[in-house]
């Protein structure tokens, strides 16, 4: 038996960060290859992105190789291909995964603002990005060169940069010199002089070789030295001319020292004496001195003592010039012990005199072109270079080269390097202490290497996502929480550091609370979404079209596989880094490709396809209008629907619509089939036959269709669906043709016309849906608009003209006396007969007998009026009235109020029939002759042009400025236009049956403005303008009539009937185009407004019948700048009283004398009640003297003071029970009192009441009179005052329901004038009611007629936008902690902060205007007026708290701070402004709708002091949550003592960490410890306010110290902000900034309780409003009546 039940299945949804294990658990297998589909077989590749083994079979119940086919094998895993046999639906659900070769950071957590990773790790986003993407840091630093390594691993000449040097320096001892980097050395090295080359090499201080090329230009004196001479100079010694080079000497003869043989060597000029073989003597060598003779021959034997040579003398050789001694290259000498040299053979000694010398040092590695002794010419090449580019020189080396090559090269003292950075992930505590480094610090790779050398294996640093992962794994969140809390205690709460810390603390707490692990923000595994959600489709030409996601996945897999391969090969680090970075970028692109539109900079390259279009990533699939949320979850397509053009259906009833037969057959096909099948058997062949019957359109099919349709309803919808009346239910009637027929009266709610509009039809399928549609949505029950409570389904155009024509009369009718009437009838039937027989016409005056209020009367009327009144309810008939549009509307409304909705619906049908009929009969036509031009027009124009000429003359003579001239002309033409308009109207009215007059006058079409342009004068034209233009801005600031800047001062003085000339035509085009453009521009804007409104208010439903509050808002006329925006009766209509309404005089509950209704608390006010209460006023005494009997058990029911002293109470004290007690103690029974009946009433006269002198206003309209004011009245001798009762009505603003509003505070459901039902979606209704007319609120800046003030420019939508987004127009700039308002329109309005009087308005020394206000106590308050503002008050005027003293924009937060908790004053001010915008456009919307939106805008508060909550100062928190939290704290604080007893003996569920006074973290207790009294005492002393203990395997938190409540300030949010701060994350994510909302929610592990409507639509269940409420959940609806009977039988 088919049944449908409305159980809501999902209670709440939680979002968390997925851990790698969770992702793997979702997966059906790892995707290892980037392949998708085999291009030949079109089958998915194994292990690829579409693999059947991982994701499920492509064909239903068939494995890949085809071994198993059919449902019987369901669940079998094929052993050949590994595919599980199941439904192909699995490919929509089963996921895969990719194991990453290196971790990758999830971009949402990095790029969110503020960055989650950044906040948690306390790092800046740029540093994080640098680490994740292997970035580098640019370092400008000095370099050093090691000159002496000592006991370090360095070598001499190693270059060390400053950063490393500082690190090494602390631990090691070695010597360095600063290094200089050589730049632009000039080459080659050229000789500057002619000369001889000498080469010399030496080692520098850094152990490198320097070759010295020395070129000398010299004169040389040669001196020959002979053997035996003794040289007394050294090589290189300086000598003077004539100085001895050798000694002068006499050489003795040589004698043989022993016996032996002589050997003479003439070549070397020596004699060798060899001893005899028997001797032990050694051989001796003698040099033969120059000039000595040898006395022996070669080989001769000599005896000891024989003379061998003769003696000789050698002269001294003297230097012939001064200079340097140089030994010749052939000089053979022997060094002697005294430092001189003995010459062994003849040679040369030179004395060189250097004329010029040049030294050229050359660094090692340079190529030297010359050798020692080479002669070079000036300009010859000596070497290819002296230094290399980028060579590092030590300071000493630099000095050498600098002195020899002063301008030949540059140096840099500091070098600029890009250093890869790494982050420390692990460090030995001692090393940390020593170096000051900690985990999470960023160092360059060079620094890291330095630390590693000093502390091997004690420090670890890394870059890339793996480093971030390690850091996150290292976080001890509990310790971190204790640390931050301890640090916060030391800081002032408003400091920026504290705010930053609090943000971090909140995040830490979120992670702890949600159970998310921080390292999960770094992905090891990437999930692959099911293939059917990213399909590949074959397109013609054999190619494949695929989703961007596949391309992103492919890139990711390719990079991942390449990285795996490189890791296996052991590739160098630099290649791996690059590959890892690319992998990270691939993961980023998959999750969020592209720089974000939300104003974030992105360092990543956007991945694009062939056409350069960015690929759509997962984030793009969620966000925006085309995203998953708004496109698919909130905007689903509906089956069983059709769409067609609409045409008018004049013979339909109001609840019917015509559906084309073909369409109906298609829509109801299943029902028709079922009906046909129900008769015969249900075999397959029968099915086919029946289907054929339908498809071949056989007659029996149509019969069955007629039967099926009977009693069912369909829904009709016209886009755009701006409010709920855009979808209504109708009973379908089958019609021929292809168009849907629509009843003409329901056009206004649909905003439909028949110029080609289309409408959609939907069929509610289940019985429950049918019932809902029929009883709640049927068009006859939706005549009344929920926006304002008046009818909205109304007759228009032809129907109105028909009714008007029927009831109108000729000119002579009113003047005709009854006795002159020719025709008299006894009954309407008789009159009709006369009409049909042609005796009378519809408009012939007749006398006729009709029943009026139950009695027969003879009246003068016309047959038309009799016919029309025939269809009206008897008590509403009026035979002497013309029924135009207004009258008909009032008639329908009155019928609804008196006789209910059904009678009203029938009346609409009757009016439609009669209207159409008589519109046809009337033969209404239009011709040019009907446009009557007023004869006086030409004369008026002539005079006007004359006046214009005079103005122009005055201007030319200089009597008027340009501004004044323009202004005068415009005013003149405006008044003329108005005059001609009146004349045109008058001229037309001369013939009541003039078709144009009838159309305009009846309200059927057109207005007098259009007629004026056709037959009168077009008048002044508007310019198109740019609101940002300087002219316009300056006008606004000066507060001038803005329209003057926007108007041509040359009028179109012709009308369209006679035609305009070329110039005037061109002037007209401006305005025409502006209208078009404005409309186009504002439609989308209005749509966005509606969307924001709905988002803000969607969760407001009627939650309970009564919240029980006694609060409310005061009923009053809404007055904005002197104009009444809304009268009090409209304000009261549909509301519920919050308190009894008391008669101002008697103070008893007020009673309506006509109906006898008493106005007590919780009474709902109808139209009549509202009119009665709004008009009820009385003259009441200000004061009365009475003597009262104090033995009675009640005080007087009005404010009273004692008129004589009683006990210690002085005269004038308020009469209370204490005073009476004192009187009784004195033995009195009666005391004299002054009673003030006016206290607590409201002043009801529009003219203010002045004091005796007439200088001061004592009372202003609508002021509530208190005792202070009453005494002032008394002092000024005022005896009686006209007052009305103080009426407090309930309002959504003051409702105390936790969610939504209660029925009593909302009041009447305007669409049926009954109290609203629980579950009604009042928020959405409110949003629609405000948004729907938005399109009408286009910038109608130019109202022709009446001079407009500056307030007009900001008309319409701009005003609405300004009110709902109050901060978009006021830029708050914080300077020095003070908020300053930058003006948008004019300046800021000054608010009065007290009740009082304007004492004076004066100017101070600086020339600024100051307003002095005196309050009731006589204190003076001064307010300085900003330069551009206008003073809005005058001396002696009474002002009340919160009123504006000057022109300008109200700064809402200032107003909010002025008032009490409720925010009512702010809301009422907003209401005035916004109502004004709508009223000007003639749009009526009930206040309660605005109040609901304002309630939502005021629903948040800013935390001033978070107390013991997890909130941060300045955080926005729903008021409900704050109040709940504070309530819980008060309850919790009461239980502290009890809890302390309870926890003794329990086991701790979490460890307890606290900070000592020295700032160290200590652990007080471990998890699992037992709580003893001693431990508890310690915990309490440490200031820990709650502990977690185990109770029956559950963790329970106990509060053991009192907590601080939250202090807060009410905030007025803009619509957008209010929607984004919505507590449920699903709805907020669907609104805007999807990624950020989801990120924040995932971290918190946020639970969406699915309270609002949107969330439930998103998860696909009934909304918790109306029949979707849990109250109705148990109801089961029988689909077929038979089933119940069967059940009984069973």
Swiss-Prot record:
Its cofactor is Mg(2+); Zn(2+). It comes from the Bacteria. Mg(2+) binds at residues 753, 755, 757. Keywords: DNA-directed RNA polymerase, Magnesium, Metal-binding, Nucleotidyltransferase, Transcription, Transferase, Zinc. GO terms for biological process: DNA-templated transcription. Coiled coil: none annotated. GO terms for molecular function: DNA binding; DNA-directed RNA polymerase activity; magnesium ion binding; zinc ion binding. Zn(2+) 2 binds at residues 1107, 1295, 1302, 1305. Binds 1 Mg(2+) ion per subunit. It is an enzyme of class 2 (transferase). Zn(2+) 1 binds at residues 63, 65, 78, 81. Its EC number is 2.7.7.6. It catalyses: RNA(n) + a ribonucleoside 5'-triphosphate = RNA(n+1) + diphosphate. GO terms for cellular component: DNA-directed RNA polymerase complex. InterPro entries: DNA-dir_RpoC_beta_prime, DNA-dir_RpoC_beta_prime_bact, RNA_pol_asu, RNA_pol_N, RNA_pol_Rpb1_1, RNA_pol_Rpb1_3, RNA_pol_Rpb1_3_sf, RNA_pol_Rpb1_4. The RNAP catalytic core consists of 2 alpha, 1 beta, 1 beta' and 1 omega subunit. When a sigma factor is associated with the core the holoenzyme is formed, which can initiate transcription. DNA-dependent RNA polymerase catalyzes the transcription of DNA into RNA using the four ribonucleoside triphosphates as substrates. Belongs to the RNA polymerase beta' chain family. This is DNA-directed RNA polymerase subunit beta'. It comes from Thermotoga maritima (strain ATCC 43589 / DSM 3109 / JCM 10099 / NBRC 100826 / MSB8).
């Amino acid at each position: 038996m088919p049944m449908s039940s409305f159980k809501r299945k999902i209670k709440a949804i939680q979002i968390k960060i997925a851990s790698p294990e969770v992702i793997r658990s979702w997966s059906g297998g790892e995707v290892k290859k980037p392949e998708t589909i085999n291009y030949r077989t079109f089958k998915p590749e194994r292990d690829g992105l579409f693999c059947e083994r991982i994701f499920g079979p492509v064909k239903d119940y068939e494995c890949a190789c085809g071994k198993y086919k059919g449902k019987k094998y369901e669940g079998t895993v094929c052993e050949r291909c590994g595919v599980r046999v199941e439904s192909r639906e699995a490919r929509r659900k089963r996921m895969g995964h990719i194991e990453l070769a290196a971790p990758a950071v999830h971009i949402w957590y990095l790029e969110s603002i503020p960055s989650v990773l950044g906040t948690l790790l306390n790092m800046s986003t740029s540093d994080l990005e640098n680490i994740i993407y292997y970035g580098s840091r640019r370092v400008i630093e000095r370099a050093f060169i090691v000159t002496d390594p000592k006991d370090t691993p360095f070598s001499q000449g190693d270059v060390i940069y400053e950063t490393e040097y500082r690190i090494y320096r602390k631990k090691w001892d070695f010597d360095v010199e600063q290094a200089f980097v050589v730049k632009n050395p000039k080459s080659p090295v050229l000789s500057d002089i002619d000369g001889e080359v000498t080469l010399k090499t030496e080692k520098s201080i850094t152990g490198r070789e320097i070759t010295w090329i020395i070129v000398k230009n010299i004169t040389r004196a040669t001196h020959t030295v002979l053997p035996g001479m003794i040289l007394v100079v050294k090589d290189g010694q300086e000598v003077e001319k004539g100085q001895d080079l050798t000694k002068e000497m006499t050489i003795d003869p040589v004698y043989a020292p022993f016996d032996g043989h002589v050997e003479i060597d003439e070549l070397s000029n020596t004699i060798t004496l060899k001893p005899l073989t028997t001797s032990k003597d050694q051989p001796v060598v003698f040099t033969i001195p120059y000039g000595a003779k040898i006395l022996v021959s070669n080989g001769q034997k000599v005896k000891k003592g024989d003379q061998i040579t003769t003696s000789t003398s050698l002269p001294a050789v003297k230097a012939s010039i001064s200079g340097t001694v140089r030994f010749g290259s052939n000089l053979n000498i022997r060094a002697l012990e005294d430092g001189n040299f003995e010459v062994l053979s003849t040679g040369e000694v030179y004395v060189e005199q250097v004329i010029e010398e040049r030294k050229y040092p050359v660094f090692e590695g340079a190529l030297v072109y010359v050798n020692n002794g080479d002669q070079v010419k000036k300009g010859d090449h000596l070497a290819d270079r002296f230094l290399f580019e980028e060579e590092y020189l030590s300071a000493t080396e630099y000095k050498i080269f600098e002195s020899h090559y002063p301008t030949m090269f540059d140096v840099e003292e500091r070098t600029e390097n890009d250093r890869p950075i790494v982050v420390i992930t692990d460090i030995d505590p001692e090393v940390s202490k020593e170096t000051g480094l900690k985990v999470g610090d960023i160092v360059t790779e060079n620094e890291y290497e330095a630390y590693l050398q000093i502390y091997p294996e004690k420090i670890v640093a890394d870059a890339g996502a793996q480093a971030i992962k390690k850091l996150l794994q290292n976080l001890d969140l509990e310790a971190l929480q204790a640390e931050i809390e301890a640090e916060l205690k030391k800081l002032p709460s408003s400091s920026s550091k504290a705010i930053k810390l609090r943000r971090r603390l909140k995040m830490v707490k979120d992670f702890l609370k949600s159970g998310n692990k921080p390292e999960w923000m770094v992905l090891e595994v990437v999930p692959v979404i099911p293939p059917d959600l990213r399909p590949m489709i074959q397109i013609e030409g054999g190619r494949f079209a695929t989703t961007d996601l596949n391309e992103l996945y492919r890139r990711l897999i390719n990079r991942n596989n390449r990285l795996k391969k490189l890791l296996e090969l052991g590739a160098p680090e630099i290649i791996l880094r690059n590959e890892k970075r690319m992998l990270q970028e691939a993961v980023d692109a998959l999750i969020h490709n592209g720089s974000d539109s939300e104003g974030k900079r992105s360092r990543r390259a956007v991945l694009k396809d062939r056409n350069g279009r960015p690929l759509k990533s997962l984030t793009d699939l969620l966000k925006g209008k085309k995203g998953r949320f708004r496109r698919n979850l909130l905007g689903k397509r509906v089956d069983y629907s059709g769409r067609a053009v609409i045409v008018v259906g004049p013979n339909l009833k109001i609840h019917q619509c015509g559906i084309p037969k073909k369409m109906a057959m298609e829509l109801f096909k299943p029902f028709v089939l079922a009906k046909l099948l129900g008769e015969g058997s249900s075999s397959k062949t029968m099915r086919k036959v029946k289907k054929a019957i339908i498809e071949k359109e056989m007659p029996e099919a149509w019969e069955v269709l007629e039967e099926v349709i009977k009693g069912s309803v369909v829904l009709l919808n016209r886009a755009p669906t701006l409010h709920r009346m855009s979808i209504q239910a109708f009973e379908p009637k089958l019609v021929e043709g292809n168009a849907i027929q629509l009843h003409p009266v329901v056009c206004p709610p649909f905003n439909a016309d028949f110029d080609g509009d289309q409408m959609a039809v939907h069929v509610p399928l289940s019985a429950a849906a049918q019932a809902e549609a029929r009883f709640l949505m049927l068009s006859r029950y939706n005549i009344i608009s929920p926006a304002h409570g008046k009818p909205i389904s109304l007759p228009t155009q032809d129907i109105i003209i028909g009714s008007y024509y029927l009831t109108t009369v000729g000119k002579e009718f009113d003047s005709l006396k009854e006795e002159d009437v020719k025709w008299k009838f006894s009954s309407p039937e008789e009159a009709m007969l006369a009409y049909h027989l042609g005796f009378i016409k519809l408009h012939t005056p007749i006398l006729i007998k009709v029943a009026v209020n139950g009695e027969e009367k003879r009246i003068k009327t016309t047959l038309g009026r009799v016919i029309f009144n025939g269809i009206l309810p008897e008590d509403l008939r009026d035979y002497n009235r013309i029924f135009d549009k207004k009258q008909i509307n009032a008639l329908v409304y009155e019928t609804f109020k008196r006789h209910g909705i059904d009678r009203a619906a029938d009346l609409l049908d009757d009016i439609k029939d009669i209207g159409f009929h008589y519109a046809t009969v009337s033969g209404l036509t239009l011709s040019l002759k009907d446009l009557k031009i007023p004869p006086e027009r030409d004369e008026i124009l002539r005079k006007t042009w004359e006046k214009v000429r005079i103005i122009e003359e005055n201007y030319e003579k200089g009597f008027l400025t340009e501004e004044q001239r323009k202004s005068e002309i415009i005013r003149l033409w405006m008044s003329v236009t108005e005059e001609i308009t009146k004349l045109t109207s008058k001229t037309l009215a001369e013939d009541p049956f003039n078709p144009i007059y009838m159309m305009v006058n009846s309200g059927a079409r057109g207005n007098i403005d259009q007629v004026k342009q056709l037959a009168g004068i077009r008048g002044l034209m508007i310019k198109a303008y740019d609101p940002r233009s300087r002219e316009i801005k300056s006008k606004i600031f000066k507060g001038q009539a803005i329209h003057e800047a926007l108007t041509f001062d040359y009028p179109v003085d012709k009308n369209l009937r006679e035609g305009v000339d070329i110039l005037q035509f061109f002037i007209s085009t401006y305005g025409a185009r502006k209208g078009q453009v404005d409309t186009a521009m504002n439609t989308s804007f209005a749509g966005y407004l509606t969307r924001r409104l709905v988002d803000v208010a969607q969760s407001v439903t009627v939650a309970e019948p009564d919240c029980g509050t006694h609060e409310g808002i005061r009923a009053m006329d809404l007055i904005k700048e002197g104009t009444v925006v809304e009268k009090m009766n409209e304000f009261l209509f549909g509301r519920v009283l919050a308190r009894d309404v008391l008669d101002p005089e008697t103070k008893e509950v007020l009673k309506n004398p006509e109906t006898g209704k008493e106005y007590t608390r919780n009474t709902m006010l109808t139209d009549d009640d509202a009119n009665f209460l709004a008009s009820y006023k009385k003259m009441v005494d200000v004061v009365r003297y009475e003597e009262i009997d104090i033995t009675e058990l009640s005080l007087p029911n009005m404010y009273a003071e004692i008129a004589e002293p009683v006990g210690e109470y002085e005269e004038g004290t308020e009469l209370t029970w204490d005073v009476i007690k004192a009187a009784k103690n004195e033995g009195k029974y009666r005391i004299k009192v002054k009673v003030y009946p006016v206290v607590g009433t409201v002043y009801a006269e529009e003219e203010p009441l002045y004091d005796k002198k007439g200088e001061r206003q004592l009372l202003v309209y609508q002021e509530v009179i208190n005792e202070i004011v009453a005494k002032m009245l008394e002092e000024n001798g005022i005896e009686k005052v006209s007052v009305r009762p103080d009426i407090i009505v309930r309002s959504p603003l003051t409702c105390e329901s936790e969610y939504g509003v209660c029925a009593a505070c909302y009041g009447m459901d305007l669409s049926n004038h009954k109290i609203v039902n629980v579950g009604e979606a009042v928020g959405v209704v409110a949003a629609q009611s405000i948004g729907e007319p938005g399109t009408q609120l286009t910038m109608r800046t130019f109202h022709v007629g009446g001079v407009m003030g500056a307030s007009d420019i900001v008309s319409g939508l701009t005003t609405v936008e300004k009110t709902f987004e109050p901060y978009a127009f006021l830029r708050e700039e914080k300077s020095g902690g003070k908020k300053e308002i930058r003006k948008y329109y004019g300046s800021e309005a000054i608010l009065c902060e007290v009740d009082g009087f304007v004492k004076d308005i004066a100017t101070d020394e600086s020339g600024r205007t100051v307003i002095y206000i005196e309050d009731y106590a006589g204190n003076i308050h001064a307010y300085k007026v900003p330069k551009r503002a206008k003073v809005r008050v005058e001396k002696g005027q009474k002002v009340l708290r919160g009123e504006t003293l000057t022109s300008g924009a109200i700064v809402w937060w200032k107003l909010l701070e002025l008032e009490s908790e409720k925010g009512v004053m702010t809301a009422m001010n907003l209401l005035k402004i916004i109502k004004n915008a709508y009223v000007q456009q003639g749009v009526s919307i009930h206040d309660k709708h605005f109040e609901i939106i304002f309630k939502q805008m005021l629903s948040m508060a800013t935390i001033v002091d978070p107390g013991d909550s997890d909130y941060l100062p300045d955080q926005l928190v729903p008021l409900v949550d704050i109040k709940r939290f504070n309530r819980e704290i008060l309850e919790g604080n009461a239980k502290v003592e009890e809890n302390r007893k309870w926890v003794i003996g329990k086991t701790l569920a979490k460890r307890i960490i606290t900070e000592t006074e020295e700032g160290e973290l200590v652990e007080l207790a471990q998890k699992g410890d037992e709580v003893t009294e001693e431990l508890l005492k310690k915990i309490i002393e440490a200031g820990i306010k709650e502990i977690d203990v185990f109770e029956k395997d559950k963790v329970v938190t106990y509060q053991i110290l009192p907590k601080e409540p939250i202090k807060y300030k009410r905030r007025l949010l803009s619509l957008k902000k209010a929607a984004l701060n919505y507590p449920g994350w699903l709805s907020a994510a669907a609104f805007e900034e999807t990624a950020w909302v989801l990120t924040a929610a995932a971290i918190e592990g946020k639970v969406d309780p699915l309270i609002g409507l949107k969330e439930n639509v998103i998860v696909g269940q009934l909304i918790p409003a109306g029949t979707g409420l849990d109250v109705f959940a148990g109801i089961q609806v029988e689909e077929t009546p038979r089933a119940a009977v069967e059940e009984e039988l069973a």
